[in-house]
Amino acid sequence: MAHVGWPSAHIVGHSYGALVALQMALDSPERVRSVALLEPAARGVSSSAEIAAALEPVIAAYRSGDTARAVDLFLRHVCGDGYRPILDRAVPGAFAEAVAEADLFFQAEMAAVQQFSFGPAEAGHVTQPVLDVTGANSAPRFAEGSELVRSWFPQAEHFVVPEAGHLLMVQNPEALAQRLADFFSRHPIGGVSGPGLVTH
């Protein structure tokens, strides 16, 4: 943000990126005008044990050297079995890119997420407006995550993206963009809606 000359921005984070958005709101509150959390990969939901069990074959595939299978199993877990046509249509080459970056994801990013700690105490230091977003067709664990987020932030706004799952930004971009624009417009930066920064 400093590099491009933005003193502050609206921060949008999806999945693991939503955890980055929360950490940024804690570490640099003067730079964060509002936070939009798109189905954050929140720890501490009631189905955490089931999620861990579902990820075991993913980790096993990666450790065996079958990186493409590991990525496929992971994306099926978070996005549903029908994720590939949706992803290929919106972002050609995205799967191949994910496979190419699998070492970074499995060796660094996933470990960092497991170590990420956020709860009511941390939430108490986040004073910026919060928008909690879920997809209407997402797996139940994301609804659990949404409930957890709203327990941390009782004043948070909630929006359900119709006809969308975890890939909500590519399944229904218009509905999501309209809701984000409305949210940003009601929390202007210096009298204008200001730039937005997206983390994934």
What are these regions (language model features)?
Residues 1-9:
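Conserved acidic catalytic loop of the alpha/beta-hydrolase fold
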Residues 11-13, 38:
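Short beta-strand immediately N-terminal to the catalytic nucleophile in serine-hydrolase-like folds
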Residues 13, 17, 21:
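Gly/Ala-rich beta-loop-alpha elbow adjacent to hydrolase catalytic centers
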Residues 22-63:
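Flexible "cap/lid" loop of the alpha/beta hydrolase fold
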Residues 62, 138, 165-168:
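Glycosyltransferase donor-binding loop in the core domain
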Residues 65-107:
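Conserved alpha/beta-hydrolase catalytic His-Asp/Glu region
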Residues 95-152, 157-160:
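Conserved serine/cysteine hydrolase catalytic core
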Residues 154-200:
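Catalytic active-site module of serine/aspartate enzymes centered on a nucleophile-bearing elbow/loop
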